A protein has these predicted regions:
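N-terminal cap/leader regions of alpha/beta-hydrolase-fold enzymes
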Residues: 1-199
Length: 199
């Protein structure tokens, strides 16, 4: 190692560190701008697909901050109302609701391409006053019941629960076996013996 190569290496290291620092802070700036813009828009779901609100839990007798959406199939995709509908329950986390359908190759996209009607349970940012977990379970039961009404000639809906929504899907299926079809829980480790009712 000569003094000139040492200086050259030091210069390259300093230049690289400075460039990476600028890129790091620029990434944070872009992330912050995206967050502010999303909040300015009213925190809509990050779904890639168009949708229609079927039921809004904020209008229920026991209001909850959840809603049932019907995913509108994109151009070129045809769904069969007699095929098993899918109800995808989104997890409460991340940048907002919609992670299960934020790109074409997602749970929503795959089910649509196979010709299944797809429904999506989203959440609004703030819970309703006095809302309980049991209220949410009841709302989800009403959502699934409504999907069954919309597809009377189809098999029972498949329920997909992502992360903590996997637990909601399991509670829903356990309490309402006559309304639910197969249940898929994604990233939701289950402990069948842990916890207590009031904890």
């Amino acid at each position: 190692v000569t003094p000139s190569t040492l200086w050259q290496s030091g210069y390259e290291y300093a230049l690289d560190a400075a460039q990476r620092t600028v890129l790091f802070w620029d990434a944070l700036r872009q992330r912050g701008n995206n967050f502010v813009e999303h909040e300015r828009q009213g925190l809509p779901p990050v779904l890639r697909f168009d949708y229609e609100i079927v039921m809004d839990g904020r209008s229920f007798k026991r209001p909850v901050n959840y809603a049932l959406l019907r995913i509108v199939p994109p151009k070129g995709v045809t769904v069969d109302a007699k095929r098993r509908p899918y109800v995808i329950i989104d997890p409460r986390g991340g940048h907002g609701p919609g992670i299960g359908g934020f790109k074409d190759d997602s749970q929503v996209g795959v089910a649509l391409r196979e010709g299944h009607p797809v429904y999506f349970v989203i959440f609004f940012p703030n819970p309703e006053p006095g809302q309980t977990l049991l209220d949410v379970c009841e709302a989800e039961r009403e959502f699934v019941h409504r999907v069954r009404e919309l597809h009377p000639d189809a098999p029972k809906p498949g329920i997909v629960g992502n992360c903590q929504a996997g637990w909601a899907a399991m509670m829903l299926a356990a309490a309402n076996p006559d309304d639910t079809g197969p249940v898929v829980i994604v990233g939701a480790p289950m402990s069948y013996w842990g916890g207590a009712w009031r904890e």
